[in-house]
A protein has these predicted regions:
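Unchanged
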Residues: 21-46, 54-108
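Nudix hydrolase/Nudix homology domain
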Residues: 11-14, 87-134
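N-terminal strand-loop-strand
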Residues: 1-16, 28, 43-44, 77
Length: 134
């Protein structure tokens, strides 16, 4: 599983590559753009999905509270090497490919480890509900 490392003061966590969708952009086009911006992967990646949808709703109700909808795709990097990856996104501090058995020890936002470990190609898309990682 390909993840991007992020940091906040005193806290390291991992996210799926991704971000917002620009006006007029399809979800798959946004996915390819984000792979380029965050990981320098310029070629189109074969994708399946969406495979899951997750809400991340901030438990703190305020003007700055967040509600992020994650639309998760599966993809195949086709044997691409990630050694020379250079992110254009200043928030991305690194990246790594994780084996499914290694995800239990990863601070992942949203916390979708169990879903990913159970998911198989061809499974129907699922709504995982509201998941918030602190």
């Amino acid at each position: 599983m390909l993840l991007c490392r992020h940091e906040k003061p005193g806290k390291e966590y991992w996210l799926l590559p991704g971000g917002g969708v620009n006006t007029g952009e399809s979800l798959v086009d946004a996915l390819h753009r984000e792979l380029w911006e965050e990981l320098g992967i310029g070629e189109e990646v074969a994708v399946e999905g969406p495979v899951a949808i997750v809400d991340s709703i901030s438990p703190v109700q305020s003007f700055a509270a967040k509600h992020v909808v994650h639309i998760i795709f599966a993809g195949d990097l086709g044997g691409r090497s990630l050694e020379a990856v250079n992110s254009q996104d200043a928030a991305v501090r690194g990246h790594s490919l994780f084996g499914l058995d290694d995800l239990d020890d990863v601070v992942l936002h949203p916390p979708i480890q169990r879903f990913v470990q159970r998911w198989r190609p061809g499974d129907p898309a699922v709504y995982l509900g509201a998941l918030w990682a602190r």
